[in-house]
Regions:
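Short Lys/Arg-enriched alpha/beta "domain-start" segment
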Residues: 241-331
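Flexible helix-coil transition and linker loops at the boundaries of alpha-helical arrays
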Residues: 15-19, 50-53, 86-96, 131-135, ...
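"A position-specific structural signal for the A-helix of alpha-solenoid helical repeats
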Residues: 1, 29, 63-66, 97-104, ...
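Single-residue signature of alpha-solenoid repeat helices
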Residues: 9, 43, 77, 118, ...
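Structural motif corresponding to the intra-repeat A-B loop/turn of tetratricopeptide repeats
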Residues: 3-4, 37, 71, 112, ...
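TPR/TPR-like (Sel1-like) alpha-helical repeat modules
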Residues: 53, 58, 82-89, 110-134, ...
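Residue at a conserved register position within TPR or TPR-like alpha-solenoid repeats
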Residues: 34, 68, 109, 177, ...
Length: 694
């Protein structure tokens, strides 16, 4: 093995076992070598025999758990893990192989799309059995917890939710079972408690969690709904309702299938002319990454032309949209791709991101592009399910570029007026405003508004939604809200917290939780309060928050980077003062200056100033941060490109021209908003996670 001759080692171990099969150390090697060779079937046989001969061996049980989960025998793997844990406790020692088995089960769950269960298994492993971080379990857990495609409320760290004095004994029993992966036994303990106290919402919430971690989604949803029925006033009931609607995959009744529609084009020239003259279409300027993403739709061929399909025609479509905002009609019913001369087959039109309810309208537009002919539908694929309301809110960014602030103020005002008039299927015939006055419906209104703030955490959306929250008098008691967040480590309620009312420790705790879960925009709400208190807060946490805040500034404020830059410089000075890593802050400053230099709209004076700052910054980075593991490679790359940028600026200035802005060097996904480039109306490119889907 040391000489990297695993095949020879495997043959030798097999030979020795044929002579004497009663050797636990040889079976441990055999299982390890079988897995290294990628022989799943042989490993399963070896693990089964190992566990049969040595039923109390933690290593044998760990290998058996790995074999079972690789064969999709999840319940059996969990039982083997539980027995493994119990034997480790009895022997007073935890083997590395047992932690590896626990992590393997967690990885398998994540690969199968069972994210809440994966987080539970990995959290137990990292917290209880790998506190010294001897494996990569911690990194894997954080990676999964920060996945943006999974609803935040379903990727929080595990908690029993049993905090009342009367359920302390139950909490102790449940916790002991959980630490040993005995989720079924914990579930039975809660069910026995509910036989004597069926009206306790915390017990029902705990039951929902336990079923969730066992991949029993219908049972979990049922328990969460019961909790919500019993807690119609507090934040726990809202969290329960939020989870239940996600598990039922119905959302607030506005979830629809999202289609990719492909049509054959009989007359390419006429159709292309119709596309270019249609006032409902706006040509999309795509960067290289976006074009690469589109290649998979038509083999390796990029579309000849791409358009946003707007519901309202130019030039007055924006005002029409505002007038109809309370009707919840997505602004962009689809994204149109035209494939013409560059393909060997017939010309085609592909329309992506089409909600089922918008298909008739989209097909009427296609018919018009084809000169009134009935379109020949080649493909109609359901690519995901999507919320109509969320799609409408995300579409707003397509009409606010390139100068969003002016239009957004008008949009925000109109949203505050319109949202209370919206209707949801679970609340019909009531509007949100009417339902907020009904004690039986109020939690649904809270859940719906909170869901929007979690799904679309950008300030342009959260500000008007939170204003509606206040307008409808939906606030919880501040102490009650903080208590639930504190006890459950759940960041889902963060949009409702008032940062100014949090103690220093609770403020830092919430910031850490949000950063851990990758919630930059929610975290940014707490930044002003952190800045006000930074002299008495933990500098390391402040430095971490600075990095998150600077990333948002770069994403949303790069056109104003010269005015933003002093704030970033202050962050860097703070980090230097406290001896904290700050290379990433320098890198974001570098990217902000480069964005200005590459901008089409920045004036020559602004570019000259940005270039001067860039030279100064580059010299500093090259002198002091070249060996910085965080940004060393980035420094080298941009240092090499600086000379080319300088030459281009000199040439363009001499010719009296502006330098064209190249494609943004960042990865595009449908829920990344950019003030500089509109997003594609393709929510299917990054599907929203639902239970059991990955």
């Amino acid at each position: 093995i040391a000489a990297d001759q695993s095949r020879a080692a495997r043959q030798q171990v097999t030979t020795w076992l044929e002579r004497d099969s009663n050797r636990a150390c040889l079976w441990a090697y055999k299982c390890l070598l079988d897995r290294a060779a990628g022989s799943i079937e042989e490993h399963a046989k070896s693990a089964a025999e190992f566990a049969r001969l040595f039923p109390n061996s933690p290593v044998a049980l760990a290998e058996l758990a790995i074999a079972q989960v690789l064969e999709n025998r999840f319940e059996e793997a969990t039982e083997s893990l539980a027995r493994c844990t119990e034997q480790c406790e009895a022997q007073g020692y935890f083997y590395y192989r047992t932690v590896a088995a626990m992590t393997t089960v967690g990885e398998w769950l994540a690969e199968q799309g069972h994210i809440p269960a994966a987080i539970a298994y990995l959290w137990i492993t990292s917290t209880r059995y790998d506190s010294q971080k001897q494996t990569d379990t911690h990194d894997l857990l954080r990676e999964i917890c920060s996945r943006g495609d999974v609803p935040l409320e379903l990727r929080v760290l595990p908690a029993t939710a049993l905090t009342k004095d009367k359920v302390k004994e139950l909490n102790s029993s449940v916790s002991q079972h959980i630490w040993r992966f005995r989720f079924s036994a914990a579930e039975q303990a809660v069910e026995r408690y509910l036989e004597t106290d069926p009206e306790e919402p915390q017990a029902w919430y705990c039951l929902g969690n336990l079923r969730l971690w066992q991949i029993n989604y219908p049972g979990a949803a049922e328990a969460y709904l019961r909790c919500a029925q019993l807690d119609q006033l507090g934040p726990l009931g809202v969290l329960a309702l939020l989870r239940a609607t996600k598990l039922k995959k119905s959302g607030c009744g506005d979830i629809e299938d999202l289609y990719l529609l492909r049509y054959e084009v009989p007359d390419p020239q006429r159709t292309k002319e119709a596309l270019l003259s249609d006032r409902h279409l706006s040509q999309a300027s795509l960067n290289n990454q976006q074009l690469e993403d589109l290649r998979g739709i038509h083999g390796e061929v990029a579309p000849e032309a791409q358009f946003f399909l707007f519901r309202y025609p130019k030039p007055d479509g924006f005002q029409q949209f505002l007038a109809d905002l309370e009707l919840v009609r997505p602004l962009v019913p689809g994204f149109v791709l035209y494939y013409g001369r560059q393909t060997d087959g017939p010309a085609q039109i592909v329309v992506t991101g089409v909600l089922e309810s918008d298909r008739p309208w989209v097909e009427s537009r296609v018919r018009e592009w084809l000169g009134g002919e009935e379109p020949k539908l080649v493909e109609a694929s359901v690519v995901s399910a999507y919320s109509r309301i969320i799609k409408m809110l995300r579409d707003l960014h397509l009409i606010t570029s390139p100068s969003p602030d002016g239009q957004w103020s008008e949009i925000e005002s109109r949203l505050v007026e319109s949202i209370p008039k919206w209707r949801l299927p679970p609340l019909e015939p009531l509007t949100l405003e009417e339902a907020a006055r009904d004690p039986q419906k109020k939690q649904w209104v809270r859940m719906f508004l909170l869901d929007i703030m979690l799904r679309e955490p950008e300030p342009h959306v959260t500000r008007p939604v939170y204003e509606v929250w206040k307008k409808l008098e939906l606030d919880f008691s501040s102490d009650e809200l903080v208590a639930v967040v504190d006890e459950m480590r759940d960041p889902s309620l963060a949009p409702l917290l008032d940062p100014a009312r949090l103690s220093d420790q609770k403020l830092l705790d919430m910031c850490f939780i949000l950063a851990y879960h990758g919630q930059r925009y929610l975290l940014d709400r707490f930044v002003p309060e952190v800045l006000d208190r930074r002299d008495r807060l933990n500098p390391q946490v402040v430095g971490m928050i600075y990095q998150q805040h600077a990333a948002i500034l770069l994403e949303t404020k790069w056109p104003e980077w010269l005015s933003v830059r002093p704030e970033v410089q202050d962050m860097i000075a703070y980090c230097e003062q406290h001896g904290l890593p700050h290379g990433k802050l320098h890198e974001m400053d570098l990217l902000g200056l480069l964005a200005l230099l590459n901008s089409e709209s920045a004036s020559p004076e602004v570019k000259d100033q940005a270039l001067s700052f860039l030279r100064e910054l580059s010299k500093h980075l090259f002198s002091h941060h070249l060996d910085d593991a965080e940004i060393g490679p980035t420094v080298k790359r941009y240092w090499e490109g600086l000379a080319e940028i300088t030459r281009e600026l000199k040439v363009s200035s001499a010719a009296g021209q502006d330098v064209r802005r190249p494609s943004e060097p960042k990865i595009w996904t449908p829920d990344v908003e950019s003030a500089s480039e509109p997003r594609l109306a393709q929510p299917e490119a990054k599907k929203l996670w639902v239970p059991g889907m990955d």
